[in-house]
Amino acid sequence: RAMALVLAAKGAKLALIDLNQEKLDESAQLCIDAGGEGKGYVANIAKEAEVEQVFNNIIADFGQVDVLVNNAGIIRDSMMIKVRDGEITKRMSMAEWQSVIDVNLTGVFLCGREAATKMIEKGNQGVIINISSISKAGNIGQSNYSAAKAGVAAMAVTWAKELARFGIRSAAIAPGFIATEMVASMKPEVLENICKGVPLNRMGEPAEIGKAVAYIVESDYFTGRVIEMDGGLRL
């Protein structure tokens, strides 16, 4: 939502996709209040037919797609193999693996493919931005998530090479620890330890990721790169 509001404040017309109609309506109104336009669309981005239909609906309402921000994502954290007292007690299930891959990787591919299709069909230039994560470098307990986030970063670079001839740019952003609702629910001592590991000594704000999105959108010569927004965590 923070990314949408940053763009709305610049007057953007926003098509918002989610599974929750109530949250979509709320976000759309906030975008309008911020100075832009907003309309919500319910769709499961892991399903090809739903992605194709929702982009058709967006074209019908807005005429064209100029920017796609691939931000949908879930986590199903688990060790690949968990061992206790020399005994294997759990393995990451195929359900845990596949659910994350379906949304975080396949969903990004489907939306990217559909957005590029519409841009080429309409003859308009555009930009596709994939939200990756610093977990793309590998993180304990996140085989599924790390694989997906590495994949979407690589896809952004691949698409930049494939789509440049159409005037379509592609890039990715890899956030570090961001003060989302999920992170804010952690114990205070855990949050303190996280911040100690960040050179800037704090977590990032969602709006700061939104500013990075706006930078990519507004920078016509920027493509094929992954911006790491992590407060210097990986220095």
PLM regions with names:
Residues 66, 74, 87-109, 129, ...:
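Catalytic Tyr-X3-Lys loop
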Residues 9, 36-37, 64-65, 119-133, ...:
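Active-site loop of short-chain dehydrogenase/reductase
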Residues 21-22, 42-54, 94, 208:
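The beta1-alpha1 cofactor-binding region of Rossmann-like NAD(H)/NADP(H)-dependent oxidoreductases
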Residues 202-229, 234:
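C-terminal substrate-recognition "lid" of short-chain dehydrogenase/reductases
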Residues 1-15:
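Canonical Rossmann dinucleotide-binding motif of NAD(H)/NADP(H)-dependent dehydrogenases/reductases
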